[in-house]
């Protein structure tokens, strides 16, 4: 019996030793290359919270490392589980990686998330999850439907959504009072705008009963939530990538894939049958691509790429911006004055005007900075290159090594943005956003050739909603909402965002 117990203990010890050796095999990787390794370094890597604490955002673990080393080094060696990764502490180096040396860092870590399940085809059809020449082709196809000239022709879609938004607020005020949960309101607006722009349909999110959530909005909410949780789940499997194949892990669920396939097929058939003929929107672009040889599945992949940016991230920025303005009455009044002055001449704001209202732009950029919907950007070294570590030291990087650009940390660094936690739109006056981006300090959409392709759509959605709300209502904060982790990807308002909408006297 004692022999059996001893044998079992030996097996346990050996198994533990094997696991420990497997997890820590690379932990001298950065030391051997003359790069400081972030401490503490556990068997779970530099960011153990990603594996052991569901309620702790990866952003917080990165923040701890950033705070400890940012004043000492341009970059520091870290590990996501056992995967070696550089954390870029110097924004100037971030600009170099994202822009100047883009050809050496062309691919993203998300491109390694696909291909493990052949049925997960729509995520594989997104440039966000693609690499190499495939990324270049998919991005080119996608961007063609999002050019400024095309959005200008489609601007009436956003204007109509803005009018529906005001009508919905009025119905909500009559039925439930002036206090409206604004997170829900924001996503109702972005659901309506994206359904109309991408598929040419009325989602019913603003025209249905107050508080009722239709199939499109519900499916979009479930789909985007699953997409962000998949990001974290796939990051966790960096410790053992074979797990993805073993369990045929999917990024999007089968149910949502089927929903958006049916929706896209029906939309294409309706348009080709004469409904909405001559309309300039994203659906017309998808049909043009199909006429050149794209399949319906290619169209679904492109549609979902735009939808993720236009629905989820735009909605998040919108309710955060309204929350900030509700707390800062002076800034809200200044922005309202600018909007009303622009409205005075024509009765509505044109596409060109909405993109040339300086204070609206400042408030939008400050909201992007505070929210930072994409907290970090990960790039893969695709060609051998050398980076300057400072103090006459350089580092030779090999293909396959990943780097993290921590946009959230730059945006909330008091050395870059004094009183960084405060809402101060004046930070972005006189074209400061462009200057800060070139310094690598302002990266809400990333930078370089892989900059977020839904950037213009998101900007148009948020600005249009703000114009329609502030030209009709005074928005007041009813209670403080704490910040908290959300899907591990960022730090967002955690709880109901209840704001009071008081009709302006005209």
Swiss-Prot record:
Single Gene Ontology MF annotation: iron ion binding
Protein name per the record: Probable cytochrome P450 309a1
Localization (cell): Endoplasmic reticulum membrane; Microsome membrane
Lineage: Eukaryota, Metazoa, Ecdysozoa, Arthropoda, Hexapoda
GO cellular component terms listed in the entry, alphabetical order: endoplasmic reticulum membrane
Cited InterPro entries: Cyt_P450 (IPR001128), Cyt_P450_CS (IPR017972), Cyt_P450_E_grp-I (IPR002401), Cyt_P450_sf (IPR036396), Insect_CytP450_Detox (IPR050476)
Membrane topology summary: Peripheral membrane protein
Family statement drawn from the similarity comment of this UniProt entry: Belongs to the cytochrome P450 family.
């Amino acid at each position: 019996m004692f022999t059996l117990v001893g044998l079992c203990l030996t097996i346990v010890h050996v198994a533990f030793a094997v696991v420990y050796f497997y997890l820590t095999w690379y932990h001298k990787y950065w030391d051997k290359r003359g790069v400081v390794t972030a401490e503490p370094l556990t068997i779970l890597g530099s960011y153990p919270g990603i594996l052991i604490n569901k309620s702790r955002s990866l952003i917080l673990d990165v923040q701890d490392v950033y705070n400890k080393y940012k004043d000492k080094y341009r970059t520091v060696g870290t590990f996501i589980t056992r995967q070696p990764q550089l954390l870029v502490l110097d924004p100037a180096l971030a600009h170099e990686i994202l822009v100047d040396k883009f050809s050496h860092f062309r691919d993203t870590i998300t491109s390694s998330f696909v291909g493990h399940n052949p049925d997960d085809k729509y995520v594989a059809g997104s440039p966000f999850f693609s690499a190499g020449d495939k990324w270049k082709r998919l991005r080119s196809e996608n961007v063609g439907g999002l050019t400024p000239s095309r959005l200008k022709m489609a601007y009436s879609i956003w204007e109509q959504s803005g009018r529906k938004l005001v009508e919905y607020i009025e119905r909500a005020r009559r039925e439930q009072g002036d206090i409206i949960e604004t997170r829900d309101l924001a996503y109702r607006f972005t659901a309506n705008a994206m359904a109309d722009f991408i598929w040419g349909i009325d989602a019913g999110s603003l025209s249905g009963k107050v508080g009722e959530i239709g199939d499109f909005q519900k499916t979009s909410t479930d789909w985007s939530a699953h997409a962000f949780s998949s990001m974290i789940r796939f990051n966790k499997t960096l410790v053992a990538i074979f797990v993805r194949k073993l369990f045929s892990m999917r990024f999007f669920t089968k149910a949502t894939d089927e929903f958006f396939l049916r929706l896209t097929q029906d939309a294409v058939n309706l348009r080709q049958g004469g409904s909405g003929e001559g309309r300039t929107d994203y659906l017309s672009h998808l049909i043009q691509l199909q006429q050149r040889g794209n399949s319906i599945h290619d169209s679904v992949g492109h549609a979902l790429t735009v939808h993720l940016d236009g629905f989820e991230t735009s909605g998040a920025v919108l309710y955060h911006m309204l929350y900030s303005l509700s707390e800062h009455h002076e800034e809200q009044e200044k922005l309202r004055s600018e909007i009303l002055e622009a409205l005075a001449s024509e009765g509505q704001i044109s596409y060109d005007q909405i993109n040339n209202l300086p204070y609206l732009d400042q408030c939008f950029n400050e909201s992007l900075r505070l929210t930072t919907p994409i907290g970090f950007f990960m790039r893969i070294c695709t060609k051998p290159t050398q980076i300057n570590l400072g103090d006459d030291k350089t580092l030779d990087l090999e293909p396959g090594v990943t780097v993290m650009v921590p946009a959230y940390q730059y945006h909330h660094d008091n050395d870059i943005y004094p009183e960084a936690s405060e809402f101060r739109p004046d930070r972005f006056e006189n074209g400061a956003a462009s200057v800060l981006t070139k310094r690598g300090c302002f990266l809400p959409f990333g930078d370089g050739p892989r900059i977020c392709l839904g950037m213009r759509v998101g900007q148009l959605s948020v600005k249009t909603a703000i114009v329609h709300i502030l030209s009709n209502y005074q928005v007041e904060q009813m209670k403080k909402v704490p910040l908290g982790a959300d899907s591990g990807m960022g730090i967002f308002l955690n709880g109901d965002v209840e704001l009071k909408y008081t009709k302006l006297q005209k």
